[in-house]
């Protein structure tokens, strides 16, 4: 069975990110902190932070990263969270936190971020934590949480503007305009 692929352009991702920002603004939520999850969540987080600032909501913002690896003789993956110390040192229970990524897939990374924040922040964990992603895959979600803000639902394999891994040369040249010419300069 062939999995359908949805190719997302940089402009589409940017506009969807601004749309998310307007959704967040219209909901009345005013985050004190915005966290973009490296890699895909960072450009989305930047656009959301920019449009919220334009609309009068200044916020602190930072990127964090998650990684997965297989432990020795283990069948399950553990998700680790990196770069969260700034949040732990600066957030309070009264703050509002927005976690931003490009897609909500299984939810494992979000669960790891929330669990790490709870463990390390203890009483300082913000009481209002929300999530925003342009894309949501409800059938892949394995946790008891859904994003508060999203634009699209899909089961397709999403190919974001920066992604090349897992694509054939034919797919890259057909779906990533101008990349053939750029790659022709590789020595």
Language model regions located:
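PRPP-associated nucleotide enzymes
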Residues: 1-187
């Amino acid at each position: 069975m062939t999995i359908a692929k949805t190719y997302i352009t940089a402009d589409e991702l940017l506009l969807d990110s601004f749309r998310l920002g307007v959704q967040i603004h219209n909901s009345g939520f005013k985050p004190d902190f915005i966290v973009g999850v490296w890699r895909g969540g960072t450009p989305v987080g930047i656009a959301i932070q920019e449009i919220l600032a334009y609309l009068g909501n200044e916020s602190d913002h930072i990127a964090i990263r998650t990684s997965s690896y297989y432990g020795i003789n283990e069948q399950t993956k553990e998700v680790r969270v990196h770069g969260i110390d700034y949040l732990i040192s600066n957030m309070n229970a009264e703050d509002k936190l927005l976690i931003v990524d490009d897609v909500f897939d299984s939810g494992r990374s979000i669960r790891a971020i929330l669990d790490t924040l709870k463990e390390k922040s203890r009483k300082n964990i913000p009481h209002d934590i929300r999530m925003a992603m342009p894309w949501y895959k409800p059938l892949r979600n394995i946790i008891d949480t859904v994003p508060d803000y999203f634009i699209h639902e899909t089961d397709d394999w999403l190919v974001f503007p920066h992604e090349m891994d897992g694509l054939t040369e034919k797919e890259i040249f057909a779906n990533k305009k101008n990349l053939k010419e750029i790659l022709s300069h590789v020595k």
